[in-house]
């Protein structure tokens, strides 16, 4: 029974990493679609939503089966709990990617505008957070997860700066209002992806160290 339980834990880890790869790819495709005004990539992101939702359900079912199989030791219980929470955050990352793709589809219908926002730079930072959060899970390294927490403030500042700049641009040139609003929503979605990456990092620290570092409390050694 114990061997089957550990096989289940390995399967749970593998499925979550697969889902993480899908969610990360969806964000990268959506932001590349913005950069290239690529409708084909937008549709690919929309098409990926069902697959991400399906694997989310599979992970939840497997996690519940493992909890019912036997009473896990503390570290295994923390692992399963963390996986279920990370699973929910990854599904929401996929949702944000869909939101970005939909905004890009709106933007492509409009004339290009010179907007005071660097979406590719913000996207690169956010994608890096998601990637590092997943690496911290794969390697069970709280130090990697802590680096993600520090990056969240950087993205928040980018989002705040984008808001101010885009609102000013709309006042100066009302003709670009819709383009600016779409870009503003994309920035907000990216900021939410960063929040989910932060949640994932916090869950990894909880699993590895048994420490609750939500609200950016310092994690004990």
Feature annotation, model-predicted:
Residues 1-221:
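Cytosolic, long alpha-helical scaffolding segments
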């Amino acid at each position: 029974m114990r061997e089957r339980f550990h096989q289940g834990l390995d399967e749970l880890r593998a499925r979550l990493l697969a889902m993480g790869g899908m969610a990360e790819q969806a964000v990268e495709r959506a932001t590349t679609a913005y950069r290239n005004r690529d409708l084909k990539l937008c549709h690919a992101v929309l098409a990926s939503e069902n697959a991400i939702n399906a694997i989310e359900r599979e992970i939840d079912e497997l996690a519940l089966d493992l909890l019912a199989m036997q009473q896990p030791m503390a570290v295994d219980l923390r692992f399963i709990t963390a996986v279920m929470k990370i699973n929910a955050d990854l599904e929401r990352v996929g949702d944000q990617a869909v939101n970005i793709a939909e905004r890009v589809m709106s933007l492509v219908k409009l004339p290009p505008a010179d907007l005071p926002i660097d979406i590719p730079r913000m996207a690169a930072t956010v994608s890096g957070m998601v990637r590092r959060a997943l690496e911290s899970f794969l390697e069970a390294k709280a130090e990697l997860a802590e680096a993600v927490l520090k990056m969240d403030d950087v993205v928040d500042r980018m989002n705040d700066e984008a808001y101010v700049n885009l609102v000013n641009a709309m006042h100066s040139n009302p003709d670009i209002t819709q383009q600016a609003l779409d870009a503003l929503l994309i920035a907000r979605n990216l900021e939410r992806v960063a929040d989910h990456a932060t949640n994932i990092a916090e869950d990894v620290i909880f699993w590895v160290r048994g420490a609750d570092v939500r609200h950016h409390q310092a994690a004990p050694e």
